[in-house]
Amino acid sequence: MNFKLGYIQGRFVSLINEKIQAYPEKEWKKDLSIASKNGFSNVELTLDLDKIYETPLLNSGNDILKNELYKRNINAVAVTADFFMQSLPWQKNNNGLEELSKIVKDVILNMHNLGIRILVLPFVDESSLDQKDIPKAISFLSKLTTTLKNSNVKIAIESDFEPNLL
């Protein structure tokens, strides 16, 4: 049998601020190398808000990321937007909402450029939705429709909602 193993970025290197899931800013290449050597062929990239435009996905050098993935024979299948947990759109004023919307659109466009098709939005833990937040979350996501269609990127929602509320 030929299995294609995948992992979430950062699992093969040191914890960041004692968190198991965080973008490994200083060790992202090492993380890919270790994953490749251990038979992993798929990765879900992680994006935190801190220095988000300095990550290889969003900076002008996303060719660096593309080349590293190619060299390691690893396919980036998704991006987890952990920055959502650090900057909740439904708790923003209009300026903050526009800034976050720009970040999300930039992420989607760069995902498209690299052929990554799934953006995971975490609505769990710190970013869990209250009933009152649902309309704001729907409104925020609705404004991404054109960008998503044009880029062929889909959103996957990680949620702690009861199934009947999803």
Please tell me what each predicted stretch does.
Residues 1-106, 112:
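N-terminal pre-domain/capping segments
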Residues 26-29, 68-72, 87-166:
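Active-site acidic/histidine proton-transfer and metal-coordination neighborhood
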